[in-house]
Amino acid sequence: MFIGHFGVAFAAKKVAPETSLGTLILAAQFLDFLWPFFLLLGIEHVRIAPGITRVSPLDFTDYPISHSLLMAIVWALVLGAMYYALRRNMRSAWVVGAAVLSHWVLDFIVHRPDLQLYPGGSARVGLGLWNSWMATIAAEVFCFGAGLWIYLSCTRARDNAGRYGFWALAAFLFFGWLSTLFAGAPPGVTALAWGGMAMWLVAPWGWWADSHRAIAHST
């Protein structure tokens, strides 16, 4: 899943209004933010195999540190604890941790059985939604659209940066996702990894746009 993860970050603002959207994006995408580092270091591996699923051409050979269930729980606890140590807000810390773990849950839905339960384990799981174009698109659009609606219902723009900066972010994510659907397989693993590294820039973009928005209070 891709934009569905960002939908989780948008929606989380409703239950953690004090938390920056940038932090929520970092949490919801943290496993994918780690993954390209491990690819470049040769610790985790992926194979480009067009046709392995109808949607994604990637054969995730092994990625136990970034994407096994056990490590997803560990990363969730680490980020939640770090947030609490910095902000002393227990509820928001739990939301940050839950956003991290939500990434594995959504990946479990779309991936073929390639997600390990723990590093070194032989069992691999995944429901394989990527084997259906229509189901994948429906799930992505629903998660992203619902998250976007929730975020817009609980925040309001304070200025043009908060209005257009946020919509530019949403458009970048949506059309970037569409481009990956129709662009075909990436030219190589290194290019794929550097493209993943570039996605780190989305977190500060989210922080900046969110800093120009205010919590919308019902009257």
Task: Indicate residue ranges for each PLM-predicted region.
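N-terminal membrane-targeting hydrophobic helices
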Residues: 1-219
